[in-house]
Amino acid sequence: MLLLELKKTNQTLETIHFLGIGGVGMSGIAEILHNLGYKVQGSDLVENYNTKRLESYGIKIFLGHAKQHITNVSYVVISSAINSNNPEIKEALERKIPIIRRAEMLAELMRLKCSVAVSGSHGKTTTTSLMACLFEAAGLCPTVINGGIINNKSTNAYLGSSNYLIAEADESDATFIHIPSTIAIITNIDPEHLDYYKDFETLIGAFKSFITNLPFYGFAVCCIDHTIVRKLVDDITERKIVTYGIDSEDAHIIAFNINTDIASSTFDVKINIPNVLGTTIIEKITIPTPGRHNILNSLAAIAVGIELDFGIKAIKNGFNNFKGVKRRFTKVAEYNNAVVIDDYAHHPEEIKATLATARNIADKQNGKVIAIFQPHRYSRMQHLFDDFMRCFNDADMIYITDIYAAGEEPIEGVTGQNLVDKITKNKHHDQANFLAELEDVVGVIIDNAASGDMIIIMGAGNISSFANELDERLSSRT
């Protein structure tokens, strides 16, 4: 029996326990189930923004993991980040409590909706958020499950009143190919999560299945500026695919006349989708977030809006209402007329896109770009070491901390210091420095910040918490 049907009967699911409930993906699903009337609880190692938010809704949160936490639960939901040695998993196995993967629970929520699944190596969260704003502007309030905090809502998930559900589809362990989506988005495909997939071709194959698993009446939206995505699109003939890009003249949706500053991007769009609009120009679309990569993200949302006949007014209004996403080029401080930005970038391609945006802004202000980066996961650094060496070219100064483990064991020779040494040795940059402590970031800013500078703090680890305290820390040092 389907999960949502079960709720409509007199049967109950008793308690659903989320292991790692503070994660962005897990917290979103937990919140939706809570809003649907299910009894939800969860555990995580540390308190964070998500656990505090869920607790404020009346959801019981355990800090730390212990077998006692699942004494009276019927189901345990886990993500791929949870180790099989976790005491709560061991207890669930011992007591034969069903263990459900996050993707399976997400799929169940999506099954009875017209679902939009947003996938890709980068840009998923912003694309999902932009699309949600367009749906609302079109009068369709969707249910949304996102991988980041949507500033408009101060949450990463909310229950809507329409028959649409928009979800970020996590490709990290291939479970996304089983999501029952009607509309599938692929923003890009880069070598990522190779600790799971083992090789790039297997990862590409998973994205192909993601599209071919669509129902015959569904469609995919793909960015063909990305070489791998273009090849994938060329290989698929059995599903409808709408393409978009900036550099691809043969794309169905193309952005041009682009202007960007520290707070926004403005552009025109040419639309040429057979049997939909013919050739149409939409002038002066503005999104309140900078960067070429975010223009591409907005084109994916526009493609869906055009296919669903939202209308040009709804598309423009939706973007005007967008307030951004937490940790996506977020201003956290100013010092000596320099701006400090916090960003989630943790993959070489994300770092390049973020620094390119900063470079564009800094050049207009006669400033420099100072990049401060905390690497995330030893396995990612090992697989993409050469790419990490080459991704900081748009920065004038680079500061790299030690690697945030995210539960992984250290790998010999894979360190932040080693990355700095190799960047210098191979002459990729002559201003690369190692930071032994996060606290040293304060001194870097005080010693180097000047008017017009863009100071970009990047990483998927705990550097964000530190970045959000910088305004106070810098004030106390002046």
UniProtKB/Swiss-Prot annotation:
It is an enzyme of class 6 (ligase). Signal peptide: none annotated. Its main location: cytoplasm. It comes from the Bacteria. Transmembrane segments: none annotated. SUPFAM superfamilies: MurCD N-terminal domain (SSF51984), MurD-like peptide ligases, catalytic domain (SSF53623), MurD-like peptide ligases, peptide-binding domain (SSF53244). Keywords: ATP-binding, Cell cycle, Cell division, Cell shape, Cell wall biogenesis/degradation, Cytoplasm, Ligase, Nucleotide-binding, Peptidoglycan synthesis. The keyword ATP-binding applies. GO terms for biological process: cell division; cell wall organization; peptidoglycan biosynthetic process; regulation of cell shape. ATP binds at G120, S121, H122, G123, K124, T125, T126. One of its GO terms (cellular component) is cytoplasm. This is UDP-N-acetylmuramate--L-alanine ligase. It comes from Rickettsia akari (strain Hartford).
